């Protein structure tokens, strides 16, 4: 039988099988499982049939609960159906899983296992989610590798048909779902050989049909429910043996044999680890290493977790075992032990006697000691060093039980110590690491490299990619291994023989060379040439190069990319350098393979994109140069080396928590933090992003004072609040740095004052949106404006000083600003700054504006999504506070309940204000009727009103302190009032999130909240896709757009959420687009917050998922409005009370066609290449629908 190999990740490995074996696939995106649904949707779009020759129906639902419901319905009517999920998504499915499992329905749900949100959200892998489903009645089959995930997907589908027990097939999120490995693919005949078609016919025979009507899903009473529930026992009792039989048959077919409980190790092992998931591979590798050196250890891999087979499990254990460590990748606080540990203890307690075939344990085989431990939560590293520490613990006379490994628990002292230098990796494996920016294509190029080596040679290949949670512009670290033997190393590289650093700034922030092995090759993308780079390298980097005798090569990849017309995409260039230096393939062969990959990868994007990439390849090697290392300098800086080792990366002005805790996380040393340093409830300070100084921009904006008209549009659109304006008295310039710029203020309200626009050089991302929107042009040089981009590196030091000086200039009094004028409103201090959002992000300008206007009194409920990640992901937070210590209070609950969560804020704030008012009235004699009346009747509509109310509350507190408190009841009332008094100052509740949240998963919640009539403000940042999970379609996605889950183009019209909200009549509704009409956006925010009732602002937000140049995102917003694809309007119920039409259209009739604006975005253009006839048809429909919608709104606004 011929073997077919492919280099794929776990998600694709599973999806390939699941797609072949199902007819209806209901999907919903959630990291890290989304790619399984994306593959299924893409294959459906290309018309790929399943095993029986029909193309499955792949349907996106509004939530994971919806997907489970759809699958349940499909199963009940006889289809083969599946879904994919993880984490909170699995929790939403659990009610349906109980039903599906209880009805003995054949189906498989595939889970990329992930942490559940507890004290914090985490998108990374562990078994928290699947363990929450272990009582559903689903069998649970666990894969440990990419190959196993491919194989077990088939075994699970075969087993569910043969057993009628529903199956949950899970594998570790990221470590398996995203790890790229060379795997042997299952042929259709392999798949067909395991599927019993008679069982499929039986499944269909059980379907609900009016041709043979049945009733299922009854309500039962106490007299029979218990008995009926026990009736399923025979199915579960038979299940393990059936699964093992299928595994045996699979082995005969493929040569890959599996056991439901599989032992590997010494036949006479005295110590044993029991484990599930990708950790099995690491333990397997370590067991082989230790046994080769005289140890007697083993590993038992648990494949079938449910139903548990006591007899088979105990028989799999070696008779010689004396001590067992059970490792769980989850934490269940308050339990007697984690799930796998408890099952093992129970199984051995019940089964060990039978193992020895005697009524009591024999002397030769005493019951082993069993201890449990936790490892790997939220993808925490699990290395051979940690495995060895577990075995060493087992060797102790009294081993530590309920231990943790991989952390330093200095609070409850559960952790085991381990030697991080212990390694099991063979020397003949190529280990390469690449440090890249999230937007530079490094990860994509490395995936191509793996395919080139894995599929073009006999070598095995492994790729794993580590991301920080910043968006585009984040740091990515790619870990690639190549070798002649299968690679089991499911952990990060710590001894690399090749390191590529693709961004110069990383050398200043991160210990890039710590993982370099002695004599390794270093490739550096450098703005300095080979002759000058040495003197510009940070001292610590030079010391490491000398100490480890590293070889250094440099290339100015950014310059090569610019010369080739590729902008900031340096991936192909650095890939060529890697193959030239690493010697994995002959250079000529490697370059030929790279060019083939370019044509395949970028062919859909057009001939020009392919040409530019090919040109970059041809120009690369002539620009690659080796650096001569001055060996004579070794030992020159011994004193400096000692100094550097004790130096904090942050200034002493940073708070201690920032320096000692967040600072470690910022430089990727968070693994070293002990338990005691971290808040146990997940509460963190705000205002910490200002300390990060990422320095990711190659170019920053420079202000031209002679051209500027002081409109502040550049300030308003800046996604990262990195460019700001101030007016101030000339006397403030007395100690200004010599390069600090200022001009006379042009606004007559600031006569005789100075005006400055200043950029934060180390916080700017270089998106250039400020330049794009600047209306002021240099008449003598039309290509220049009042803001122009220039290289950051030469400007960094002087602009850092200028920024520090600028921050110390006084902010204008908020009470004196005309907030309806952008040039004055943008003088307000933003309380959202330097987020991890993409360069050029379309969402963050709205969030920033919100905080400028209302941040000092706002409480934010943030739906999970892009905004919760760039707004609330460690290490730093962009939400900040003003000099008075006031600022937005922020929290994230879940994706599916954010509207209700924020509604809870409002209920609480109103109740506390009500209680405070009740108490206040009881003290009118003590504090004075005038003060009480002025507080209770304060209008609180303007900045001045808010300021005055705060003064009254301060006076109230002072008066309360003067009241004698001999009476305990009186003292309690005073304490209560003092604790609640601040709630008598108006608080602004904002419920924010993206369109996936608002249009889909929590639409019901939003509907309920706005129907309540309560005073909440909802901001929907509409990117028209699920941006956070990678750009999947939502009900906000417009017709004809290609998105993940809509690979054939979205056939349905965009949901008109604003119209739905207007139907209530008592809701303020606005549709805005900052790039189209900034003053209308400002009006909408002011009116929404002022409206005493529910308000919703739907804000168009351009996104990288649209396939646009983000620099021109604001232009795209304008084009959208001019074509009528996006409407600008405000619906204000207060106007109705004045006898006016509440709906105001804030735009003219469309002046360009839908086609003109659509085809500026790749998400629409893609369809014209892949399905031109479909694209033409959908375009015509889209134009007709835009025209009809415009006419309807015109009619409604003119009544």
From Swiss-Prot:
Residues noted as binding [4Fe-4S] cluster 1 in the record, renumbered to the chain: 708, 711, 714, 774
Top EC class for this record: oxidoreductase
GO biological process: electron transport chain; nitrogen fixation; response to oxidative stress
Keywords (A to Z) from UniProt: 4Fe-4S, Electron transport, Iron, Iron-sulfur, Metal-binding, Nitrogen fixation, Oxidoreductase, Repeat, Transport
Ion transport found in the keyword field: no
SMART domains reported in the protein's UniProt record: EKR
Cofactor binding mode and count: Binds 3 [4Fe-4S] clusters per subunit.
Catalytic activity, EC: 1.2.7.-
Residues holding [4Fe-4S] cluster 2: 718, 764, 767, 770
GO molecular function: 4 iron, 4 sulfur cluster binding; iron ion binding; pyruvate-flavodoxin oxidoreductase activity; thiamine pyrophosphate binding
Binding-site positions, [4Fe-4S] cluster 3: 838, 841, 866, 1103
Gene3D superfamilies to which the protein is assigned, alphabetical: 3.30.70.20, 3.40.50.920, 3.40.50.970, Pyruvate-ferredoxin oxidoreductase, PFOR, domain III (3.40.920.10), Pyruvate-flavodoxin oxidoreductase, EKR domain (4.10.780.10)
Required cofactor names: [4Fe-4S] cluster
InterPro entries linked: 4Fe4S_Fe-S-bd (IPR017896), 4Fe4S_Fe_S_CS (IPR017900), PFOR_II (IPR033412), Pyruvate:ferred/Flavod_OxRd (IPR050722), Pyrv-flavodox_OxR_EKR_sf (IPR037112), Pyrv-flavodox_OxRtase_EKR (IPR019456), Pyrv/ketoisovalerate_OxRed_cat (IPR019752), Pyrv_Fd/Flavodoxin_OxRdtase_N (IPR002880)
Chain ranges of the 4Fe-4S ferredoxin-type domain: 699-728, 755-784
Function: Oxidoreductase required for the transfer of electrons from pyruvate to flavodoxin, which reduces nitrogenase.
Protein name per Swiss-Prot or TrEMBL: Pyruvate-flavodoxin oxidoreductase
């Amino acid at each position: 039988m011929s073997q077919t190999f492919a280099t794929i990740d776990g998600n694709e490995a599973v999806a390939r099988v699941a797609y072949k074996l199902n007819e209806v696939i209901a999907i919903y995106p959630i990291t890290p499982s989304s790619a399984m649904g994306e593959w299924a949707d893409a294959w459906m779009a290309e018309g790929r049939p399943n095993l029986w020759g029909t193309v499955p129906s792949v349907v996106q639902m509004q939530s994971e609960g919806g997907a489970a419901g759809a699958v349940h319905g499909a199963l009940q009517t006889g289809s083969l159906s599946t879904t994919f999920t993880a984490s909170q998504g699995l929790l939403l499915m659990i009610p349906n899983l109980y039903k599906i499992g209880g009805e003995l329905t054949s189906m498989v749900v595939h889970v990329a296992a992930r942490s559940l949100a507890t004290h914090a959200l985490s998108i990374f892998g562990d078994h928290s989610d699947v363990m929450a489903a272990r009582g559903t009645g689903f069998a649970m089959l666990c894969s440990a590798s990419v190959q196993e995930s491919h194989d077990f997907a088939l075994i699970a589908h075969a087993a569910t048909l043969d057993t009628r027990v529903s199956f949950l097939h899970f594998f570790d999120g990221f470590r398996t779902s995203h790890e790229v490995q060379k795997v042997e693919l299952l042929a259709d005949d392999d798949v067909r050989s395991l599927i019993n078609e008679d069982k499929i016919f039986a499944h269909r025979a059980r379907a609900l049909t009016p041709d043979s009507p049945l009733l299922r899903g009854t309500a039962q009473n106490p007299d029979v429910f218990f008995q009926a529930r026990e009736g399923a026992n025979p199915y579960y009792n038979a299940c393990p043996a059936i699964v093992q039989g299928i595994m045996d048959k699979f082995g005969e077919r493929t040569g890959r044999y599996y056991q439901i409980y599989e032992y590997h190790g010494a036949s006479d092992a005295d110590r044993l680890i029991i484990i599930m998931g990708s950790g099995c591979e690491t333990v397997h590798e370590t067991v082989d290493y230790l046994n080769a050196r005289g140890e007697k250890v083993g590993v038992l891999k648990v494949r079938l977790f449910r139903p548990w087979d006591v007899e088979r499990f105990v028989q799999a254990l070696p008779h010689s075992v004396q001590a067992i460590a059970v490792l769980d990748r989850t934490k269940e606080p308050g339990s007697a032990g984690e799930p796998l540990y408890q099952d093992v203890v129970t199984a051995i307690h019940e089964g060990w006697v039978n193992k020895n075939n005697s009524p009591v344990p024999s002397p030769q085989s005493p019951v082993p000691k069993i201890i449990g431990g936790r490892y790997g939560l939220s993808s925490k590293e699990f290395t051979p060093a940690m495995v060895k520490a577990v075995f060493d613990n087992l060797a102790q006379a009294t081993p530590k039980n309920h231990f943790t490994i991989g952390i330093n628990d200095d609070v409850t002292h559960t952790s085991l110590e381990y030697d991080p230098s212990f390694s099991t990796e063979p020397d003949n494996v190529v280990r390469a690491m690449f440090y890249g920016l999230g937007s530079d294509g490094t990860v994509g190029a490395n995936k191509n490299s793996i395919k080139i080596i894995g599929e073009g040679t006999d070598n095995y290949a492994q790729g794993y990619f580590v991301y920080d949670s910043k968006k585009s512009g984040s740091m990515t670290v790619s870990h690639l291994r190549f070798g002649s033997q299968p690679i089991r190393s499911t952990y990060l590289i710590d001894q690399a023989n090749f390191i590529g650093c693709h961004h110069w700034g990383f050398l200043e922030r991160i210990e890039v060379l710590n993982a370099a092995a002695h004599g390794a090759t270093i490739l550096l993308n450098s703005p300095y040439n080979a002759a000058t780079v040495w003197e510009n390298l940070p001292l610590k980097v030079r010391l490491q190069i000398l100490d480890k005798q590293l070889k250094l090569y440099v290339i100015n990849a950014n310059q090569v990319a610019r010369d080739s017309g590729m902008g900031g995409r340096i991936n192909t260039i650095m890939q060529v350098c890697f193959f030239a230096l690493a010697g994995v393939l002959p250079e000529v062969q490697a370059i030929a393979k790279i060019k083939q990959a370019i044509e395949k990868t970028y062919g859909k994007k057009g001939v020009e994109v392919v040409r530019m990439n090919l040109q970059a390849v041809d120009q690369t090697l002539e620009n690659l140069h080796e650096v001569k290392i001055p060996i004579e300098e070794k030992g020159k800086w011994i004193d400096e080396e000692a100094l550097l080792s004790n130096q904090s990366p942050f200034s002493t002005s940073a708070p201690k928590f920032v320096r000692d805790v967040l600072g470690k996380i910022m430089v990727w040393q968070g693994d070293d933090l002990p338990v005691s340093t971290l808040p146990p409830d997940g509460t963190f300070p705000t205002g910490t992003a200002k300390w990060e100084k990422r320095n990711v921009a190659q170019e920053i904006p420079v202000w031209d004072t002679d051209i500027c008209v002081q409109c502040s549009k550049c300030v308003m659109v800046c996604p990262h609040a990195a460019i700001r304006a101030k007016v101030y008295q000339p006397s403030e310039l007395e100690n200004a740095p010599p390069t600090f710029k200022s001009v006379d203020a042009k606004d007559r309200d600031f006569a005789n004052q100075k005006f400055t626009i200043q950029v934060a050089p180390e916080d700017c991302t270089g998106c250039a949106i400020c330049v794009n929107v600047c209306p002021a042009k240099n008449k003598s040089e039309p290509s220049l404006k009042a803001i122009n981009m220039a290289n950051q590196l030469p400007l960094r030091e002087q602009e850092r000083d200028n920024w520090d000086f600028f921050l110390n200039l006084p902010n204008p009094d908020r009470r004196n600003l005309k907030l309806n004028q952008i040039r004055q409103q943008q003088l307000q201090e933003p309380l959202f700054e330097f987020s991890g959002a993409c360069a050029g992000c379309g969402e963050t300008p709205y969030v920033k504006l919100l905080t400028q206007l209302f941040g000092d009194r706002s409480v934010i409920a943030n739906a999970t999504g892009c905004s919760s990640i760039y707004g609330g992901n460690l290490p730093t937070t962009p939400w900040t506070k003003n000099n008075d210590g006031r600022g937005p209070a922020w929290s994230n609950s879940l994706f599916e309940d954010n509207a209700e969560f924020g509604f809870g804020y409002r209920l609480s704030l109103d109740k506390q204000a009500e209680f405070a008012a009740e108490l206040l009235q009881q003290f009118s004699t003590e504090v004075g009727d005038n003060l009480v009346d002025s507080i209770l009747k304060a209008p609180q509509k303007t900045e001045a009103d808010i300021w005055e109310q705060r003064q009254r509350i301060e006076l109230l507190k002072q008066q309360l302190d003067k009241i004698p408190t001999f009476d305990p009841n009186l003292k309690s009332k005073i304490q209560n009032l003092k604790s609640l008094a601040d709630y008598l100052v108006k608080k602004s509740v904002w419920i924010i999130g993206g369109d996936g949240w608002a249009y889909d998963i929590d639409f019901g919640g939003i509907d309920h909240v706005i129907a309540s009539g309560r005073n909440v403000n909802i901001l929907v940042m509409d990117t028209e896709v699920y941006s956070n999970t990678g750009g999947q379609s939502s009900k906000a996605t417009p017709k004809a757009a290609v998105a993940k889950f809509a690979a054939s183009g979205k056939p349905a019209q965009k949901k008109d959420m604003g119209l739905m909200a207007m139907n209530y009549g008592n809701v303020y509704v606005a549709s805005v687009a900052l790039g189209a009409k900034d003053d209308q956006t400002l009006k909408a925010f002011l009116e929404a917050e002022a409206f005493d009732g529910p308000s919703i602002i739907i804000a168009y937000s351009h996104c990288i998922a649209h396939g646009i140049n983000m620099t021109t995102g604001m232009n795209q917003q304008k084009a959208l409005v001019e074509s009528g694809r996006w409407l600008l309007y405000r619906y204000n119920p207060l106007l109705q009370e004045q006898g006016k039409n509440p709906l105001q259209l804030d735009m003219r009739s469309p002046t360009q066609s839908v086609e003109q604006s659509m085809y500026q975005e790749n998400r629409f253009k893609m369809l014209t290449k892949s399905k031109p006839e479909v694209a033409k048809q959908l375009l015509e429909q889209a134009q007709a629908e835009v025209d009809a919608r415009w006419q309807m709104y015109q009619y409604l606004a003119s009544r």
